[in-house]
Amino acid sequence: MSQPPTAPPVTQEIPLQCEDELGRPLTFVSSFGYDPGDPYAVWLTFHIPGGDVHWAMARSLLATGIDEPAGEGDICLWPNLDSDGRAVVSMDFHSPEGRLVVEARTRDVYQFLARTWAVVPPGAEADNVDLDELVDELLAG
């Protein structure tokens, strides 16, 4: 199966707000990434003092979380307002190591998603998946 050439990845630095263990406001930068070769996923890399932490989530989950509550289990998102009344997307991440609840400005998240949609429109993700290569990888184990 011949695939069209893959567009370059999309990345964007987005500031995230949360509270530290003492309830003080904390802002740090996260890298949001999208690779058209893995068209269903977005990657978040939290740049924190203890080292980078990577999370993957469905691009559709991130898009849904802008307008309505979405997700269950490890990642939940919902629209919210920050303390200044600005639209944000709240994101709740759970892992065996702990929990992190952050807020990102909705406009930043939407800008990132719009850039990914320009590369691979919603609904066209399957056009960017090489099924033959995927089967070969699965069989190679």
Pin down the residues of each PLM region.
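Charge-rich, low-complexity N-terminal segments
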Residues: 1-41
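Generic detection of short hydrophobic beta-strand segments and adjacent strand-loop junctions
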Residues: 12-16, 55-56, 102
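A structural detector for beta-sheet-dominated domains
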Residues: 17-19, 45-47, 78-80, 94
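Residues that cap or initiate secondary-structure elements
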Residues: 22, 36, 50-52, 83, ...
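Generic recognition of long tandem-repeat/solenoid scaffolds
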Residues: 44, 89-93, 102
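Short, internal acidic amphipathic alpha-helical interface segments
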Residues: 52-96
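Mixed-charge, glycine-accented linear interaction segment located at domain edges/termini
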Residues: 94-141
